[in-house]
Amino acid sequence: FSGIINWISNIKNKFFRKILEIVAGIDKRVQLPKYNSETFSNFFRKNNKKINYESNKSDRKVVIYSTCFVNFNKKNTGVAALKVLKKNGVEVQEAYPGCCGMPFLEQADLPKVVQQAKKVSKDLLNWIDKGYKVVTLTASCGLMLKFEWPLLLPEDENIKKLSTNVMDIDEYVVDISNNEGLVEGLQEID
């Protein structure tokens, strides 16, 4: 199915892009994101145990919050994050309980953002209660979990707890580098 959508939405497909422009108002010159043939969540379920490295196990545990963009459009970002984390001895799980609500925030649909915050936080809190940190792979989603949700639900203790246990993937890898150091084969970029 993703192959058909990608073919129709390809900027070189002038016929269907003209139809998209007329029907949906999507400018035919705009390059639309491609869809993965497999979600990152499905990839993780099938491949997580197969990805093993001879590295020291650490006490670190994370749950990757896949995000809509990585799950449906940029699976390779999730695969790369999974490999880097596992290479550094981190126990990795994955969760995608739904969208963080950023698209709804952009449309000023605050009730829908609150609904998503409550739904997603409920699932992610289960991981936090098991000792996991939540790692986001898309900066805007990390922003929602860490800063926007607490602004919308300032009295919600679950949202507060979640917001203090979320890190962006780059922030988390820098934390590993600063504390334990990165394993051989991984190095800082100047």
Give, region by region, the residue ranges found by the protein language model.
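Iron-sulfur cluster-binding electron-transfer modules in prokaryotic oxidoreductases
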Residues: F1-D190
